[in-house]
């Protein structure tokens, strides 16, 4: 059932992408009307196969203009004494790697340093790109957007554990005692991948 649900969500995202691109470039009034109808249809499909109301989805998509592309989500892998840094999100009390959407004007490396500082209080320095993964190819729950997830290894340089606007705890965990994870942000297999990089420093970058 999950695979069927995911496939329909991917189709809804694809229909929405085609419609949004059409609205960005088409001047024909009739074509634009058809693209608007496709946008509504894709929102209805998304609502049917996700946990979000159609109004929420419509609001999320309202400001999206131009040619659609996947969103970039960057996550920092910070280790200390063979334990990985995780932060707990306030709104669901689940744990994730520090990170978030890439902001315009900042590189992925600059973004991850900023996110780690804001969410955990630690100053870090990016050292290596570990992986670039497609959210559709991993066991994330259904979501309205398509993401490329960027994992960057970072070394701690200063600071102490502090919480941010979106987080209420930051702590280091060993691989065999991980807390409840936020599956839309990171999966158990992705955490295992990062610990594997720790054990094998010469491991090649992984990408989908």
From Swiss-Prot:
Binding site for Mg(2+): 115, 119
A GO molecular-function descriptor: metal ion binding
Motif (Nudix box): 100-121
InterPro entries, sorted: NUDIX_hydrolase-like_dom_sf, NUDIX_hydrolase_dom
Pfam family, one: Nudix_N
Gene3D superfamilies linked to this entry: 6.10.250.1120, Nucleoside Triphosphate Pyrophosphohydrolase
CDD domains associated with the record: NUDIX_CDP-Chase_like (cd04672)
Source organism superkingdom: Bacteria
Enzymatic class: hydrolase
Keywords: Hydrolase, Magnesium, Manganese, Metal-binding
Gene disruption phenotype: Cells lacking this gene have an unchanged spontaneous mutation frequency, even in triple mutT/yjhB/yvcI disruptions.
UniProt domain Nudix hydrolase: residue ranges: 69-195
SUPFAM superfamilies recorded: Nudix
EC number(s) stated in the UniProt entry for this protein: 3.6.1.-
Essential cofactor(s): Mg(2+); Mn(2+)
Similarity field: Belongs to the Nudix hydrolase family.
Function description: Probably mediates the hydrolysis of some nucleoside diphosphate derivatives.
Protein name as catalogued: Putative ADP-ribose pyrophosphatase YjhB
Lineage: Bacteria, Bacillati, Bacillota, Bacilli, Bacillales
């Amino acid at each position: 059932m999950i695979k069927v649900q995911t496939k329909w969500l991917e189709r809804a995202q694809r229909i929405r992408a085609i419609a949004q691109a059409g609205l960005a470039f088409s001047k024909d009034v009739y074509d634009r009307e058809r693209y608007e109808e496709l946008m509504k249809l894709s929102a209805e499909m998304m609502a049917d196969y996700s946990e979000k109301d159609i109004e929420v989805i419509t609001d999320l998509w309202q400001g999206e203009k131009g040619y659609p592309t996947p969103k970039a989500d960057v996550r920092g892998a910070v280790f200390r004494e063979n334990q990985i840094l995780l932060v707990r999100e306030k709104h669901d009390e689940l744990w994730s790697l520090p990170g978030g959407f890439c902001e315009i004007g900042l590189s992925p490396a600059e973004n991850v340093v900023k996110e780690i500082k804001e969410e955990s209080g630690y100053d870090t320095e990016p050292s290596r790109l570990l992986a670039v993964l497609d959210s559709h190819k991993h066991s994330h729950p259904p979501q309205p957007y398509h993401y490329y997830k960027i994992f960057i290894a970072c070394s701690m340089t200063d600071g102490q554990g502090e919480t941010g606007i979106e987080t209420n705890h930051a702590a280091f965990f060993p691989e065999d005692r991980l807390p409840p994870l936020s599956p839309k942000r990171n999966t158990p297999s992705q955490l295992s991948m990062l610990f594997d990089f720790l054990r094998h420093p010469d491991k090649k970058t992984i990408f989908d």
